[in-house]
Amino acid sequence: MRKSKRERQRLLQETIRENPFVTDEELAEKFSVSVQTIRLDRLELSIPELRERIKHVARQSFADKVRALPLEEVIGDIIDIEPDASAISIFDVKEEHVFRRTRIARGHHLFAQANSLAVAVIHDELALTAKATIRFVRQVKAGERVVAKAKVTGKTKSGRTVVDVNSYVGQELVFSGTFEMYRSNMEKKDGDSNEYRD
């Protein structure tokens, strides 16, 4: 049985409050209505679109955790970060990110998402990419969502922090990279358990 508009909107607010990352498509499926109906409901309730909700959550949650660059300079939207350990961002590939003829994403967008996430995960005032080894695994098309996952995996003998970034569309790996990061505080901290790498 379909819910009344008032009941659906109440449940919509509750659902978005519990999970601000839910998409309009997922909401439409959950409430058995069209995506357009969900968008109209959101407009009536003054609930911003997913991208704006993600930015709002990121600003509230991560502003004090990301030191190496302003959040608005990160390519993609950070949805989770543990400084000097791991981070996750999402990047929705739109028409402006792809080649017109093939609708395949330009590689520099995937690299920029991964590289800026590698910088953001470094908990220091200054973090720069000293070296990057990257691999494009498969093409990404317009309309796909890329989820990049960064993990600090160790340090080089010269003291650079090593960050591995893997990017996925769904469960499929589309990009991988290993970034050696220079940081302004390159001395090994006491109790740092990261292993050294070559």
UniProtKB/Swiss-Prot annotation:
Pfam families: HTH_DeoR. It comes from the Bacteria. The keyword Transcription regulation applies. Residues 102-168 form the MaoC-like domain. Keywords: DNA-binding, Fatty acid biosynthesis, Fatty acid metabolism, Lipid biosynthesis, Lipid metabolism, Repressor, Transcription, Transcription regulation. InterPro entries: DeoR_HTH, HotDog_dom_sf, Transcription_factor_FapR, WH-like_DNA-bd_sf, WH_DNA-bd_sf. The keyword Lyase does not apply. One of its GO terms (molecular function) is DNA binding. GO terms for biological process: fatty acid biosynthetic process; negative regulation of DNA-templated transcription; negative regulation of fatty acid biosynthetic process. NCBIfam families: PRK04424.1. Transcriptional factor involved in regulation of membrane lipid biosynthesis by repressing genes involved in fatty acid and phospholipid metabolism. Belongs to the FapR family. This is Transcription factor FapR.
